[in-house]
Structures are given as structure tokens and as C-alpha cells.
Amino acid sequence: MVTVYGTIGKACCNQEALENMLQNGMNGIRINLSHTSLALDSCRDSITAYRAACEHLGVKPEIMIDLQGPEIRSGNMRNPYILEPGDEIIIRQRQRHEEKPILPVPTALIHALESGDRIIVHDGEFSIRVIEELEAIPEELHPGGDENAEFITFIHRRFLGRAEGRGRIRGRETLTLEGKEVYGNVISSADQTNLTLAAELGVTSVMQPFVRSGEDIIAVREALAGYGLTCPIFAKIESKSALDHLDSIIEQADVVVIARGDLANAVSLPKLPAVQKRIAAKCKQANRPFMVVTQMLHSMLTNSVPTRPEVTDIFNAVLDGADYLMVTGETSVGRYPAEVIRYLREVASEAEAFLAENAAGTACKV
């Protein structure tokens, strides 16, 4: 049977909502640590509610944490804002006063930027074209500690960008630099903090983002052991580097994750279906379980019924051999988290029944 994960969030963080999701066929929860922390009371309360729901229904809790890893995200922002096509924006490391809206980005991205580059925001929701590099701004900072120490001067690079399409800029949004691979550390400082708490909170699996090769998985597995964790690693395929080293990733991962959001940015949308099929086929050939994620039921963020293409997508993922399916925003912030799980489970079950019929030679019956 296909294993179904739902992402926990404000739409489903209470025991009643989680019980409904479990009753509708959810097997485990995902916690997206790019938007929360195991150290926060709100996150711990959600885990407590999930455990209570599992205990009440007599099912084993499955808690997956999705690390921040080396992915590139926008910096923290007080308030989101909307960009219209053609609107200009300043791209820089820190959110300081500017005449135009600011997109704060990490050091790794600002160092890689050049005029003409295209920044893709939030799984391709919209993009920003880098027009030109602006005059850098020096900033003097005191190192602290010794009052006699000299100030250190930092030079902040700044770029002018222009919105290509309409979109919302928020803090902690995923950013992809088209045609370039820009990464931070395999395990971020925030990941280290979360991993110190993972065993205590009963984490049962870890999702590793932006895996580039099998060596990345080995590094994370060694790090997990240092925190007293010996749990499965779900390795997300999201880049060209991952595709180039797919064999080593399949060898080292416990589960391969076809993460279609950033993967589509890496290979282009028209190529995504074929890439998904090839990854699935390689995993099946190697007898490696795999998961399919991203926009499985995206319309159900606001609608109580999925679209025909969405249910067909789920069906085909199972036909291709997917062992796991997962939804993200559909359950974490969507209006109908329990219904999302119900449709995901029902369509997956129909696909499994079809496979059984096909094996028995009766699949042509309608």
C-alpha cells in the first residue's frame, strides 16, 4: 500500500484535524523546518497534538522532518508585498532602507549574481530578471567584545531586478538562479539545532533537500548518528547535479524523492514529466522506494474537489511505482486538509487496484 504523508501547518495543527486526516488515510506527518523549528512551542504543540491523535486512533506516529539543508531562500521580512510585471526591486543581502522594495538574499546567492540572471521564486510562481549591478554600499560594524577594536567594513553588493509576472515576495521563499547551482552548507546551523531535539521529539525519518550526490547523503547520515538518530533518509532530487549523480543517490538513500518544484526549475517544465518517468524507472530497476511530491492536489488549497489532471497525476505516479506520496501546502495552509488526504488515498487505492487487475489480466474491464 502507498504511504501517504501530509505536511503539518496552521490548517491542521490540532488533534481533531489530525485525527480526521489519519482516518482518511494519512500515514505520517512532514514538518517543514524551513518555516518552523523544533525549538518553537508552536511546533512542539503540533507534534503533541499529532501524537495524541495517533494514540486515540491506535496508530503508530510517523514524524518526518524536512531539513533546510543547502537550499537558497529569501531572508526574513516583516511584511510581504506584491510585485506587478515590470516593477523594480533591489536585491541585496540585508533589508535596509532603499527607495524601492527589497529582496533580501543570502551571501551565496549575491556572490553568484550577474546582470541578465533570472531568479525563480517559490517553485516557479514568478521570476525576477537581474537588470544591473548597482553601486555597492559600505557598512561599518564593530566586532564587539573589545571596545578598542577597530570597526570592520563590509561591502554590500546590490542589484536592480525587474519582476517578470505578478507575484508575492515573502520571507523564507525558495529562490533558484536559472542555469546556475548555488548552495549553502549541506547541514545548516538551524538544522544542527533541530537535530539536537529530533530524538527527544520522536522523529522517525529525515528528508534531505537539494542532494547533489551520494556523498551528501553519507555526510548527513554520519551527522544524524552524532545526534543519536538512526532513521531513514528521504533524498530529494531537485537539481541537475542530482540527476548527474542519480545512481549514487539511489544507492545511498533509503527513499528517493522526486521533488518536482525545484526540479522543474532545473530542467524546465516541458522536460519535467520525462525526467520524473526516468527517475521512477531507475528506482524501480534498483528496487529503491521513491516518493512523488509537489502540487499533487494544488487546486485544493482553495477548492474542496480536485481537478481531473490532478487525480490523473496521482494515479500515474502510483502506476509508475511510487511507494510514497506527499502533499505540502494543501494540508499545511489549505482549506480542506482532511479532504486532500481522502482524495490522495482514494485515487492511490484505485491505482493499486488497477495494477492488481492488470496483473490478473482483467484491467480492460470498465
Segment roles from a protein language model:
Residues 1-366:
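Non-catalytic helical/linker scaffolds that mediate oligomerization, partner binding
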